[in-house]
Amino acid sequence: MPVTSAGLLFHRRTDGRLAVLLAHMGGPFWARREVGAWTILKGEVGADEDAHTAAVREAAEELGVPLPTETVPDLDLGEVRQRSGKRVRAWARRWPPPGPDPEAVRSNTVRIEWPPRSGRHVDVPEIDRVAWFSPDEARRVVVRGQADLVDRLERALDDPAAAT
């Protein structure tokens, strides 16, 4: 059965231009990669957990800084399927400028086996940095299966009835 994750795609406008916040995946496998190494803030939904609640929890855990208050309901971007088969349910939330201080972001850690099949385990941050991207640049660097979320956000901001 495919894993289901839930996440938040934060967005802001600066000088009238849309930007989205993406996180660079942590750990040695992703250290020197850019294209396909960025993701929305997301994580697995617990067995008895509401997907939106999981999305907010995961974003807070991965950023390690207070999230902006939901002043209007988060925008439901629907679900996408990544190449791995993982399903990602996402919402968008506006983050008023300037957004999180990248230096203040402190992700939680996960334990991985590294190098693979070595029997050795190391703790690595789930994400090692965050950055704001234009929609075009976001589509270039984000995990391929999540690019449609950026498209849906743009459509929804142009026409709120068009999100999913």
Describe each model-derived feature in a short phrase:
Residues 120-136:
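Alpha-helix-centered segments that form part of catalytic cores
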Residues 36-41, 47, 83, 92-93, ...:
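Functional cleft and adjacent loop/helix regions within the main domain
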Residues 15-17, 27-30, 46-47, 84-85, ...:
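Short, charged/polar surface micro-motifs in flexible loops or helix N-caps
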Residues 1-40, 91:
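N-terminal strand-loop-strand
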Residues 79-119, 131, 153:
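Active-site-adjacent beta-strand/loop module that shapes the phosphate/pyrophosphate-binding cleft
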Residues 40-75, 134:
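The catalytic Nudix box helix
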Residues 131, 135-164:
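Charged phosphate-binding loop/patch that engages nucleotide di/tri-phosphates or the phosphate backbone
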